[in-house]
Curated annotation (Swiss-Prot):
SUPFAM superfamilies: LeuD/IlvD-like. The lineage of its organism: Bacteria, Bacillati, Bacillota, Clostridia, Thermoanaerobacterales. InterPro entries: Aconitase/3IPM_dehydase_swvl (IPR015928), AconitaseA/IPMdHydase_ssu_swvl (IPR000573), IPMI_Swivel (IPR033940), LeuD (IPR050075), LeuD/DmdB_bac (IPR011824), LeuD_type2/HacB/DmdB (IPR011827). Keywords: Amino-acid biosynthesis, Branched-chain amino acid biosynthesis, Leucine biosynthesis, Lyase. It catalyses: (2R,3S)-3-isopropylmalate = (2S)-2-isopropylmalate. This is 3-isopropylmalate dehydratase small subunit.
Amino acid sequence: MQGKAIKYGDNIDTDVIIPARFLNTSDPKELAEHCMEDLDREFKNKVKEGDILVVGENFGCGSSREHAPLAIKASGISCIIAKSFARIFYRNAINIGLPILESREAVDGIEEGDIVSVDVDNGIIRNVTKGTEFKAQPFPEFIKEIIKYGGLINYVREKVR
């Protein structure tokens, strides 16, 4: 996957990703309309399909809500690269099939607007704009399968056939 980097800092919690006032719906399109709006009012206009979210430490901390990764995925973000993720967000992202990678070096080496290419299977992150490459820990095979099928529910459906 390849897209433009959209970059934010540390400790972005789930209440910032999708504010509680919008939790009365689980419609991905509606969630996408309000994704990150308390942090960046232009987020929904800034994101194009396939863009890559690049964030700092402890991304997705706070309340456990599947709405947060759903909103990000529905907004068009194809992958999140972070210095670190809150564990519950990490699991929720995998469960809905949103690719996520941890790499401090990549986050430090990518600027807003850079074109970034990601090979999730092998944990390779390339800053196409700067010609640099970074490594992240690739997922185990079963996690790759969950992401490939678009989330845990689709994965289970496929396996029980």
